[in-house]
Amino acid sequence: MSAMLLLFVCLILGTVVARFAKPPAGIVQGINWWVLNVALPALVLELIPKVTFDPQLWFPVAAMWLTFGGAWLLFGLLGPRLGWSRQRTGALILVCGLGNTAYMGYPLIEALHGKPGLALAVVADQIGAFPVLASAGIVVASLYSGRAPQPRLIARRIATFPAFVALVIGIVVGLLGGWPELLNGVFAPIGATLTPLALFSVGLQFGFHPGHRQWGAASWGLGWKLLLAPLLCWVLGAITGVGGLVLTVGVLQAAMGPMVSAAILADEYELEPTLANTVLGVGIVLSLITIPLGNLLLGG
C-alpha cells in the first residue's frame, strides 16, 4: 500500500510544483536525462542478471508488438472511415500503440508484484516497447508526416541507447553467474531513484487540453489502449499456455497508459500534438485506476 501511495504522491507533487512553484527551466529535461541515462541502466544492470530466462518470456515482448501492430491496423482502417487526417491517425497509432511501460510501468508493477514483477516489466519494456518505439514508431511517424524513414538511424538509435547496452551486458552477466554482491549494492540505490523521479517528471509534464473535436478520437484511442489491447494480449497468452506472473505482467504492461516519449515523437513530427497530449494526460490518470483493477481481474 505504501508503494502505491508513493506513486500518487510523486505524481501529484510534480503537478503541484509545475503549477505553483515555478520550477527552473530545463528541469524536466534534466530529470529525464538522469532517469533514461543513469537510473534506468542501473536498474537494468541490477535486475536482468537475476531473471530466469524461460520459454514464456516471449509473451511480454510479443504483447508490446501486438499492442502497437493492433493500433496501426485499427486506426489505419478506422481513420479514413471517420474522416481523420493522416496526422490524427498517426498520432493515435503512436500514443495508443505504445504504453508507458517504464515511467509508469516500473513503479506500478513493482508496487503490485515486487522485484520479480519488476524484472519482467523491464523485459517487456527493454526488449519489447523500446525497440517498437525506436523502429516501428519512427516508421509510423515518418509515413504519416510525409517523411522518409532512415533505417540506419533507427538501428543506431537502438544500439546506442544506454539501457539497451545495459540490457545486453546484464544478459551476459546473468549467463556468467551474476554480479559480485559489492556491485549489486551500487546498482540498487541508483536504480531506486527511477520511480520517484519518473513519476515526478510525469507530473511536471501533465497536460489536459481537450478540444471539442478531440473527444471521439481520444475515446477510440483510449478504448484500444486501456481495454481492447490488454484483452487481446490476455487471449494470446491464454491460448498459448502462458500463465502466472509472466502472463499478468505482460497484460498489465500492455494496459499501461500512453507513453510520454510517443507523445514527444508525435510533437516532433507534427502529428496533431494537442490530441496526443490530451490522450497522454487522460490515459495516465485513467491507468492509475484501470491497472489495479486489471490486476485484480488477473488474480494478482
Report residues per predicted region.
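Alpha-helical transmembrane segments of multi-pass small-molecule/ion transporters
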Residues: M1-G300
